[in-house]
Amino acid sequence: VTGADKLAIKSTAAVRFVDSEGDGNLDMAFVTTPIYGTVNTYNADRNDFSTTAKLNNRNITSSRNAANFENFTFEDDLVKDDVIAINIDVTSGEILYTVSLVEPVVGELTRVTANDKTITVGGTAYGFYEGEFNGTAPEAKVDNYGSGDLGKELTLYTDGKYIFQATDGTSGKLGTNFAF
């Protein structure tokens, strides 16, 4: 299984089960994880969409090509630097992309728990995503936050449970496992 370490407990990606023979038995199971990144360009009138998100080490783009652009479904209006999730569907035999905005979570940092690698913002505890953001490992880590950050308002981008992009902390730790 390729990339299983990234799905084990650091993703909320759903598992799809397929009965391709129609006999009531599962023939296949697969996981499609979203790809996260930011918008470089978006202009539907020009069939133009490009992003920092990568698939097989290549930026996902329509290349201003109408046929390529038809493979994208946009759930939201986009502007440069929006944080997005791209879900890929290959069940039709073609690579189809669904692009949606990732809404930020804004709240006060009230707890840093280094042992569990979590922070609590707005009353919810979040771990840190271990997949890719903008084609590289996310820079958001529990080590970025310390006691000097408690009470600070943070902006997080999450998959609902794991942070892949966040406001930087001061990294001025004086120890671990702080609460405010």
Model-derived segments and their meaning:
Residues 1-180:
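...the same signal can extend to comparable exposed beta-sheet modules
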